[in-house]
Each structure stands twice: as C-alpha cells, then as structure tokens.
Amino acid sequence: MRRPSRIRSLAIAGTAILLAVISSPAQAHEPWDDGSVPPPPPSSPADGYSQNMHLLSTASHAGGVNSDLAFAGDLVFAGHYGGFRIIDISEPGEAVELADVHCNGPQGDVSVWGDLLFLSVDTPQSTPGCEGSRNVTATTPGAWEGVRVFDVSDPTAPEFLQAIRTDCGSHTHTLVPRKDGGTYIYVASYPLSASNIGPDCQAPFERISVIDVPGDDRTAGLAARVVAEPTVKGVDLFAGASGDFFACHDIQVLTPRDLAAAACLSQGQLWDISNPLAPRVTADVDTPDVDIWHSAAFTHDGKHVTFGDEYFGAPQEPFGAIWTYAVDSPSAPLSHLRIPRDEPSTYHNFNYVPVAGRNILVSSAYGSGTSVVDLTDPANPKEIAYYDMRSNQWSTYWYNGLIVANDISRGLDVLRLSGSQTAGARRLPMLNPQTQTFLLG
C-alpha cells in the first residue's frame, strides 16, 4: 500500500525548501544581489571520501539551485533553476565555464541533441522566453510552462529558439531517438504545489506529453511540437482536496529493447515503447519500503533495472535505497542498498558505467555526496567508493573516464575513480543519462 499523503507532504516540503533559493527573472546579475533571494551557503570541504575517489576540479556556481546534467564531446551542460551553464572539461583538472544562460524556470532538467538543447520548466512563468521571465501561478493570465529549446552550436553564445508549452509543465524529460535523425521527447509532468494546478493540470492527469523534433539542427528546433499525450495509469500520487493525481517523475529508456522504466513517485513501471507515441505499461513494480520512486537506470546488458527512492531516509529507516529488479521478471526485488554510513540515504540521479561484464552504478546522494556501487552480482550490491562534499549533490554520472557531479549549491565537480573496476569502459560521443541507446554483452 502506498502512502500518498506522505509523498505529497514530502514533495511540497522539498519544493518549498528549494524555492527559497530559486532565481526570479532572467537577468544579468545573480538574484540575491537585490536582496530578493537569500544567498546559498558557502562551499564546504569534503566531509569524507574513499581513497579511490579524487576531486580534480570544480566549476563553481553559487546561486539558485543546480540540477541535472547532459554531455557532448568535452562539454557538460549543467541545468539550474535560473537557466543552464556550458562547461568545458577537456582538461579535467581545470573545468572552465563557457556560458551561463539566464532563463528563469525551475527545475532546469536538460538534454542535448546535435545543435539543440532542451530545458524543462515546471513552475509557471510570466513569459515563454527568457527576457523578464519570473515565477507566477498557473492561474495568471498568459502563464507558461513546458520545454524551452536553444541553439548551442556556438557553446559560448547559446540562442533561445522557442518554448513548447506542455500541460502541467515539464518536471523532467527524456529523449527517445529515432533512426531518421530526429527524436521524440517524453515529458514527465505533475503539479509541484497547489499554485501549479491550472486548467490544463487537473486530476487525475495520468498522461505524458510527447514532443517531435524532426532533426538535430536549428531548423528542427524551431519545428519541434507536441504530437501526442498518451495516457499512463497507475497508483495515485496525490490524495487531497485537489483530487487524486497520477504522474511520473522520471523516465529512463533503453531503445535497443524498446523499453522504458518509469519512476512514477508512488510506484515504478516498465513500459513497452515499440510504438513511442503510445507507450504501454507492461509491469508495475512496488515495495512498501520505497516511498518516492524517483529515478531509474538499466544495466548495459539490458537484464536488470535499478530504481532510486528519494525519501531522505534516516539511518534507522529502510527508505532512500536503490532497488534492483530483473527486467524479464520484476515481481520481486533482487536486492536493495542504502548508503552504508551513519547518515541519511537518498539515491537521487545515477547511471551505469558502460563497461561489458560489470555493472557499476554512479549516483548522487544529496547530503551523502557521490556513491559508486558494484551491482555485478545484483543480489549483493556493495559500495566501492564515495566522495562526500558536506553539501548536496543533485546529479552524478559517469562520462568518459570521469565522474561528474552537479552540487545544488556549489556547482560542478569533476572527479576520478581509481582502480580496475571500470577498466575498458566505452567512450561516448555524447550522453543524455536518461537515454540508453546501446547494449553491451
């Protein structure tokens, strides 16, 4: 049995905390310069780390809330609640910021596709574009939320192209590439608070938006549009005066198997996406010891899927773990693992290292920093490395021999894991962590 009232209170409480440091209008100065937003806490030194994890450099970004990441070549695209940054990591010991695009709109989930960048906005804005955009309520005339599209062909001077409105905004989004060079975008949406519930965000909701992007250049970015709003049913997330909502937080796709793993807050789901415009739920995944189904990732052999719980579990509680299931028989978990230290556990955003024969998961863990877990034996997970910055890391991913983390208040950290566990890992031309496009034997 799920705990919808508990999930609802946690989601709203977490949003309230983060909103305290969200930037307001898009502007050239930081939002706390005018006293409207309190400054973030100062950067903190490492609280603890394993001997096989090394911090190489930091591209600081003190301001607002830093969120998710995407990668292309030597560039990292780092979302934040006031826009996004582009950072050059060609010299890992000296990460260099190339651009910081100010375009208000939490929460800044980001992906890249050729010359294009897509940015999620799930708080109603006063305007679709960047200039003068500020947080408003869903009932404000002209309020907009959805996905913004940018041309990043010149990483030092990104250009806003258009804003695609989606019902209930875009909390996160996931690319689903096509063989014709275009991509679909799955947009996961739900109301973060009562002020976000507008006429197009009504209970039970039960759907995602699908955007069609016909290519990967400027012309395709301008032509992108919503082409479907398929229904996805499950266990209600919110139960209250505003009605019973069902929605998904994050969607992971494994395109070679036409699979998706949807972390839908009140349950996990597996989808058949052989028809990408009409995904079909094939399995419901649940356990009473998961409170907020937040993220998912497939192993690179396609045999297992790992879900993360965003509950902020205290050391004595079962919550906040990662849970691993067999894709072909997900009725019961193979294992779960909490942060194996005396501190709160929350596995937040993560991916698997692309290495054949081993399943190594790299994850952010909020206040517990970055955690690296060996799941080669899915029944016996073991943390093999960690780096705790005594702050809060939103996203951590493996990318081309590096571990890259976006810390909520500090900015981007570049780390390296020493040892043989990841030897032979595949190098990638680009990475949108929620999109897995290949299998390894």
Question: At which residue positions do the language-model features occur?
Answer:
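Feature marking well-ordered beta-strand scaffolds used for ligand recognition
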Residues: 14-22, 27-441
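Bacterial N-terminal signal peptides that target proteins for export
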Residues: 1-12
